[in-house]
Amino acid sequence: MNKYVLQNARNYLGDDVEIKPSTRKFKKYMVLKPDGKWSYFGDNRYEDYTQHRDDERKKNYLARAKNIKGNWKNDKYSPNNLSIHILWQ
């Protein structure tokens, strides 16, 4: 886990956030939700902004991710929200 991931997770979810490398295939990280369940996010087959620091790729990813349909915007722990705020900031 690189320094940006932990820093972004603390900024988004607070200093007491529990984030670990994922135990699920093809997922990068898992975050413990208040209900005691884990939320898995990020695809370990692809780089994210915390790895490549390419602003153009960040802009393109965020344009795609923010247009995903569904109720993910109201769930702070949705995989899409976690990816946007932790892996792409």
Regions inferred by a protein language model and the residue ranges of each:
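Arg/Lys-rich, low-complexity, intrinsically disordered basic segments
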Residues: 1-89
